[in-house]
């Protein structure tokens, strides 16, 4: 098989002699003009070949770079998967500092690879759903092991908040499943959250959901704030529930604040108990037929919606 270069040279020489010979048949054309024109025709073929060759080299280089990028992406994904698997494995390590390191490694992975964020949040939530008790919840002094595990869990809580987007961004937020979790100083304030499951969760010390935007359904069914020394303050001021907000059977052992909060979907506090005061001043609801408030509060029409006022 002859190379394109050989065919180009043959075509160039053929044009040189062909065009030159044809022009020489014209008596008005000199020998120098005929050779010059033939040379230009042959040179044009060579120039076209050079352009084709340059384009071919460019396409080959682009293909090589694409292959290199694919190889890099595959290696990066493999390393990320290995890093994720190793971090999850270390969450079961006996040493608390190793577990804390594994939590930070997972959070770091979620920051550098956004596609891992929901998966990492699922792992952090599953860690917090593990059975846990601390003597301090009963007013006693806990063991060293309980205290170490508490610090690991507080780290997981902080990392969850850090990985959630701010409340003022657009789009749905990540989902959190904390069903039955034991939480202390739980703070998601000013974050954007998709669905939130806190069914049967135990909330000790303060819980702060102020300024949150919930784009999915939020369930606090049968959750409870802690009594005793670690009083369960529940703050949900100026939050927004775009979908269902379910507080049926929730037990609030200390003051609960829902001031200036917007409930855009179905909302119920049926069966909820409040040991201290509950505040709904400035809270708005989209449809009174879909709302059940605790005793002592009622809805009044306002600006096309409804606002909660004390009875």
Report the location of each language-model feature.
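N-terminal leader/targeting and pre-domain segments
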Residues: 70-73, 82-107, 111-138, 142-311
């Amino acid at each position: 098989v002859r190379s394109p270069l050989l065919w180009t040279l043959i075509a160039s020489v053929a044009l040189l002699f062909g065009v030159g010979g044809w022009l020489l048949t014209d008596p008005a054309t000199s020998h120098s003009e005929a050779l010059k024109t033939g040379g230009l025709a042959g040179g044009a073929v060579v120039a076209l070949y050079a352009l084709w060759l340059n384009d071919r080299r460019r396409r080959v280089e682009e293909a090589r770079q694409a292959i290199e990028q694919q190889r890099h992406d595959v290696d990066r994904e493999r390393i990320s998967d290995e890093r994720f698997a190793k971090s999850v494995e270390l969450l079961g390590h006996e040493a608390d500092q190793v577990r804390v390191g594994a939590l930070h490694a997972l959070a770091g992975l979620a920051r550098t690879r956004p596609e891992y964020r929901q998966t990492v949040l699922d792992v952090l939530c599953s860690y917090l759903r593990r059975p846990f008790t601390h003597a301090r919840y009963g007013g006693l002094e806990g063991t060293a092991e309980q205290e170490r595990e508490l610090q690991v869990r507080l780290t997981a809580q902080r990392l969850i908040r850090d990985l959630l987007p701010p409340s003022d961004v657009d789009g749905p937020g990540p989902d959190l499943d904390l069903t039955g979790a034991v939480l202390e100083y739980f703070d998601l304030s000013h974050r954007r959250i998709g669905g939130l499951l806190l069914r049967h969760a135990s909330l000790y010390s303060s819980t702060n959901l102020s300024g949150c935007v919930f784009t999915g359904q939020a369930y606090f069914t049968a959750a409870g704030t802690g009594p005793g020394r670690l009083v369960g303050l529940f703050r949900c001021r100026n939050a927004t529930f775009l979908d269902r907000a379910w507080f049926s059977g929730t037990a609030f052992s200390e003051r609960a604040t829902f001031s200036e909060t917007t409930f855009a979907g179905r909302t119920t506090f049926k069966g909820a108990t409040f040991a201290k005061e509950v505040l709904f001043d400035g809270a708005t609801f989209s449809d009174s037929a879909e709302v059940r408030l605790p005793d002592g509060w009622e809805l009044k029409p306002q600006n096309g919606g409804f606002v909660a006022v004390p009875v």
